[in-house]
Amino acid sequence: MSGPRPVVLSGPSGAGKSTLLKKLLQEHGSIFGFSVSHTTRDPRPGEENGKDYYFVTREVMQRDIAAGDFIEHAEFSGNLYGTSKAAVRAVQAMNRICVLDVDLQGVRNIKKTDLRPIYIFVQPPSLDVLEQRLRQRNTETEESLAKRLAAARADMESSKEPGLFDLIIVNDSLDKAYWALKEALSEEIKKAQGTGQS
C-alpha cells in the first residue's frame, strides 16, 4: 500500500481524543477525514447527526452489523457503537487519510481486517485526572462514571500489550499531546501532500 495509512485513535472516554482530533482536522482538514461512527445512544447537547455520530436505532444497527456492513462494533453502557465500511470508504473517496476513533474492542476487531492503520492510544496522566474531566462534563451518573473509570483502568492496562499500539500518548498537556500526534503522523501527512493535496 503506497498511499497514506488510516489512523486508529483509541483511549478512554475523557482522555482527550476528540479534542486532539478536532485540532488535527482544523489544521489539516484537506489531508485527514474523520470516519463518523454509528451509535444507538442519544445525542449529547451540541452533537449533530452525521457530524459527531450517526444516531440510529438498535434495530437498524443490529441489522447492518448482521449484514456485514461494519468494520468493528462494540457495546458500552447499553449502547452500540461501530464503524461502517461505508463511512471509511466515504473518507477514502475524498483522497483523505481516514481517522477512526474506536474503543479497545474495536482495535482488536480492526486488527483482523486488511486495513493496516497506525494504532495510537491516548491516555490521561492518571485516573484521578480522568475522573475530574468526566465530572466536568456533567453527562455522567455516579453509576455510569464508575463504569467508565473501570473501563478506563482496564484499557490503560491492556494498552501495554506488546504490538497492540504503535504509539501511546499521555495527554497531560494538550499542546504536547498534539505535537506528539502530529509527529507520529508526519510521514503520512507528507505522503498525502505528495499526492497533490495541500
UniProtKB/Swiss-Prot annotation:
It comes from the Eukaryota. Belongs to the guanylate kinase family. Keywords: Acetylation, ATP-binding, Cytoplasm, Kinase, Nucleotide-binding, Transferase. Catalyzes the phosphorylation of GMP to GDP. Essential enzyme for recycling GMP and indirectly, cyclic GMP (cGMP). Involved in the cGMP metabolism in photoreceptors. The active site is at R44, R137, R148. This is Guanylate kinase. InterPro entries: GK/Ca_channel_bsu, Guanylate_kin-like_dom, Guanylate_kinase, Guanylate_kinase_CS, P-loop_NTPase. ATP binds at G14, A15, G16, K17, S18, T19, N171, D172. Residues 4-186 form the Guanylate kinase-like domain. Expressed in retina.
